[in-house]
Amino acid sequence: MPTINQLVRKGREKKVVKSKSPALNKGYNSFKKEQTNVSSPQKRGVCTRVGTMTPKKPNSALRKYARVRLTNGIEVTAYIPGIGHNLQEHSVVLIRGGRVKDLPGVRYHIIRGALDAAGVANRMQGRSKYGAKKPKAAKK
């Protein structure tokens, strides 16, 4: 434990908090052509590649992902949630933070039902998370 004199000479160091979704903390000034420190909850981007990858060790599947170039110039890998999707190269998507635990390097999710990403078809529960509209009541 330090003495009071040691603390006066050299105080406690603050912990540096590292962001879990750093691409959302950068903006882009197109006039100055430089990045800015403007954070946002979501960002828009264009898909440069859409594909599947296999998860880490205990799991087995083909998880869908898209490589997205954001409006701030950063290119990230984002997960496409839900069953089936309509995304292809040059699709405009909205991404949010949130990693996929069994896919290394995937720190973002694509928001379904926004911009070019269609909602999940025939989804009844948890619809708001997948951009699915409320189904019409069946006529008697």
Swiss-Prot record:
<feature type="region of interest" description="Disordered">
    <location>
        <begin position="33"/>
        <end position="55"/>
    </location>
</feature>
<keyword id="KW-0820">tRNA-binding</keyword>
<comment type="function">
    <text>With S4 and S5 plays an important role in translational accuracy.</text>
</comment>
<dbReference type="InterPro" id="IPR005679">
    <property type="entry name" value="Ribosomal_uS12_bac"/>
</dbReference>
<protein>
    <recommendedName>
        <fullName>Small ribosomal subunit protein uS12</fullName>
    </recommendedName>
</protein>
<dbReference type="GO" id="GO:0003735">
    <property type="term" value="F:structural constituent of ribosome"/>
</dbReference>
<keyword id="KW-0699">rRNA-binding</keyword>
<comment type="function">
    <text>Interacts with and stabilizes bases of the 16S rRNA that are involved in tRNA selection in the A site and with the mRNA backbone. Located at the interface of the 30S and 50S subunits, it traverses the body of the 30S subunit contacting proteins on the other side and probably holding the rRNA structure together. The combined cluster of proteins S8, S12 and S17 appears to hold together the shoulder and platform of the 30S subunit.</text>
</comment>
<comment type="subunit">
    <text>Part of the 30S ribosomal subunit. Contacts proteins S8 and S17. May interact with IF1 in the 30S initiation complex.</text>
</comment>
<dbReference type="InterPro" id="IPR012340">
    <property type="entry name" value="NA-bd_OB-fold"/>
</dbReference>
<dbReference type="GO" id="GO:0019843">
    <property type="term" value="F:rRNA binding"/>
</dbReference>
<dbReference type="Pfam" id="PF00164">
    <property type="entry name" value="Ribosom_S12_S23"/>
</dbReference>
<keyword id="KW-0687">Ribonucleoprotein</keyword>
<dbReference type="InterPro" id="IPR006032">
    <property type="entry name" value="Ribosomal_uS12"/>
</dbReference>
<keyword id="KW-0694">RNA-binding</keyword>
<dbReference type="GO" id="GO:0000049">
    <property type="term" value="F:tRNA binding"/>
</dbReference>
<comment type="similarity">
    <text>Belongs to the universal ribosomal protein uS12 family.</text>
</comment>
<dbReference type="GO" id="GO:0006412">
    <property type="term" value="P:translation"/>
</dbReference>
<keyword id="KW-0689">Ribosomal protein</keyword>
<dbReference type="GO" id="GO:0015935">
    <property type="term" value="C:small ribosomal subunit"/>
</dbReference>
